């Protein structure tokens, strides 16, 4: 018994020493940081009262002038990280020395949670190989073939908005409708399915997409492992994907693939491209092919990433245009002028002529980036010119997108909505990596062309047909964000008055 007590005391002493050493890492290094709280580190408010992006923004603003180096220290639970405070170092991490920071170090478990092992999450050579295989899928030529599909769904979007406007409704919650639009677009392009989300507000596709983003399989208590020790979580065979979501999407993808292969159906969409890779694998070409689980994971993340990010950006853009009627009028004039020059037809070429619309969308993503931070991990020791700022292998690196987008050094009066910030001459004057809605470098968003295209089409159709205004009592000013979502999204939706023009 005495031996057991001694051993127990020894274990407790060792754990206490280890925890103390771990949470004093940045203090020993002399790197500015906020005092951590065990076991949360600097994330005790995370997903409760403060959003991810706001925590990093606060750290950036509070400590950037207290460091003589390119970053400050940070603890995400037990994981030690740095928050980048120097824009040139952001370029180093994302582009210049990408070979040292090519992984994200986030949770994925290919064996037990196949949908988690997607292009966004996986690391190392597996990521590089998969990225090379998928890149041809997202060329401008391939995007052009998907344009008619987006336009068809766009017609349904106008019908739904028109019904609400014709009914002389008091106000309209727009985020739900534009989410159904992007769900139908991506459901068709990624899965080859007519999801009918716009015609049916309770459509399964939207419900499952929302569940996948907002709900957790294990609850907030397990964030400690999933975020703080993702490799350990995978070894413990944990899963992040909600079971209902996994079952729904795996069945949808399996049924779609089986039907197309058996019936030789071709739709020239994302699914066709994935099926080609699966058939290569099945025929022995493992170097260029993909397994079923691999194509399922890519179809899943393509839907998830494009569904929520694009619809949220559209909602934010409509909110800003309702707030700035002069900008909305100027944008409508451009859209109408371009359409008139193309005989009233919105096509791939006329879309590319709507340059002011692109600036409006860029300024929306600058002011309200849906993905508020980028995460990387040092895959090898990084040696800085000042040894104090060397980064050990395994250290996480946060590039705080929201903070950079609101830094007055790059964007004077950052809280103002000014599309002209994206005039060519102004863009050229800003350093690289000051605009990061899609990331940057080799690991930027592979679907950025598609995402921009569906947002531009949706916005062009809406502004051409409708006027958006604040409702005197239902529109929340200033806009509030949810704190329990990984992405930046509006709290309680966005309510606007919608009338035909």
From Swiss-Prot:
One Pfam family in the UniProt entry:
p450
Top enzyme category: oxidoreductase
- Record's keyword annotation contains Calcium: no
Q: Name one GO biological process term.
A: aggressive behavior
**UniProt xrefs under CDD domains:** CYP6-like
- Topology of this chain in the membrane: Peripheral membrane protein
The alphabetical list of record keywords is: Endoplasmic reticulum, Heme, Iron, Membrane, Metal-binding, Microsome, Monooxygenase, Oxidoreductase
Q: Which InterPro entries match?
A: Cyt_P450 (IPR001128), Cyt_P450_CS (IPR017972), Cyt_P450_E_grp-I (IPR002401), Cyt_P450_sf (IPR036396), Insect_CytP450_Detox (IPR050476)
Assigned EC number: 1.14.-.-
Its required cofactor(s), as named, are: heme
Superkingdom field: Eukaryota
The GO terms this record gives for MF are:
heme binding; iron ion binding; monooxygenase activity; oxidoreductase activity, acting on paired donors, with incorporation or reduction of molecular oxygen
The record lists heme as bound by 445
Q: Which GO terms describe its cellular component?
A: endoplasmic reticulum membrane
Main subcellular localization, coarse class? endoplasmic reticulum
UniProt keyword Iron, yes or no: yes
Subcellular locations according to the entry = Endoplasmic reticulum membrane; Microsome membrane
The UniProt function text for this chain reads: May be involved in the metabolism of insect hormones and in the breakdown of synthetic insecticides.
- Family note: Belongs to the cytochrome P450 family.
- Name of this chain's protein: Probable cytochrome P450 6a20
| Organism listed in the record | Drosophila melanogaster (Fruit fly)
Task: Provide the organism lineage as a comma list.
Answer: Eukaryota, Metazoa, Ecdysozoa, Arthropoda, Hexapoda
């Amino acid at each position: 018994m005495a031996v057991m007590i001694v051993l127990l005391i020894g274990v407790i002493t060792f754990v206490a020493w280890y925890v103390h050493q771990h949470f004093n890492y940045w203090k020993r290094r002399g790197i500015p940081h906020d005092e951590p709280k065990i076991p949360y580190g600097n994330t005790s408010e995370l997903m409760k009262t403060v959003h991810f992006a706001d925590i990093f923004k606060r750290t950036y603003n509070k400590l950037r002038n207290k460091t003589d180096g390119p970053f400050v220290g940070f603890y995400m639970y037990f994981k030690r990280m740095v928050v980048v405070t120097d824009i040139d170092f952001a370029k180093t991490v994302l582009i210049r020395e990408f070979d040292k920071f090519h992984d994200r170090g986030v949770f994925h478990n290919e064996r037990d949670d196949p949908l988690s092992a997607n292009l966004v999450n996986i690391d190392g050579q597996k990521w590089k190989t998969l990225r090379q295989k998928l890149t041809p899928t997202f060329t401008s030529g391939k995007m052009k073939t998907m344009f008619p599909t987006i336009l068809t769904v766009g017609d349904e979007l106008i019908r739904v908005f028109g019904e609400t406007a014709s009914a002389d409704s008091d106000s309209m919650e727009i985020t739900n409708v534009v989410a159904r639009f992007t769900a139908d677009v991506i459901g068709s392009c990624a899965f080859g399915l007519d999801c009918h989300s716009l015609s049916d507000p309770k459509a399964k596709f939207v419900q499952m997409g929302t569940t996948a983003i907002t709900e957790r399989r294990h609850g907030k208590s397990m964030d400690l492992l999933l975020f703080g020790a993702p490799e350990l979580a995978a070894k413990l065979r944990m899963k992040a994907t909600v079971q209902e979501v996994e079952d729904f999407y795996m069945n949808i993808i399996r049924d779609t693939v089986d039907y197309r292969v058996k019936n030789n159906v071709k739709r020239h969409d994302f699914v066709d491209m994935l099926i080609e890779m699966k058939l290569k694998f099945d025929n022995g070409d493992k170097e260029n092919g993909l397994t079923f689980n691999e194509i399922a994971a890519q179809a899943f993340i393509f839907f998830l990433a494009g569904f929520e990010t694009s619809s949220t950006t559209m909602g934010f853009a409509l909110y800003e245009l309702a707030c700035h009627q002069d900008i909305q009028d100027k944008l409508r004039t451009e859209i109408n002028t371009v359409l008139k020059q193309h005989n009233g037809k919105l096509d791939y070429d006329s879309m590319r002529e709507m340059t002011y619309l692109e600036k409006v969308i860029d300024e929306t993503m600058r002011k309200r980036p849906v993905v508020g931070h980028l995460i990387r991990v040092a895959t090898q020791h990084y040696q800085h010119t000042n040894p104090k700022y060397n980064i050990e292998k395994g250290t996480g690196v946060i590039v705080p997108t929201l903070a950079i987008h609101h830094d007055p050094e790059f964007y004077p009066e950052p809280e103002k909505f000014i599309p002209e910030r994206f005039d060519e001459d102004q863009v050229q004057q800003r350093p690289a990596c000051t605009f990061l809605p899609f990331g940057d470098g080799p690991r930027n968003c592979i679907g950025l062309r598609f995402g921009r295209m569906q947002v531009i089409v949706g916005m062009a159709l809406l502004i051409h047909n409708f006027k958006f205004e604040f409702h005197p009592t239902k529109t929340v000013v200033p806009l509030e964000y949810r704190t329990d979502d990984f992405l930046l999204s509006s709290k309680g939706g966005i309510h606007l008055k919608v009338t035909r023009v």
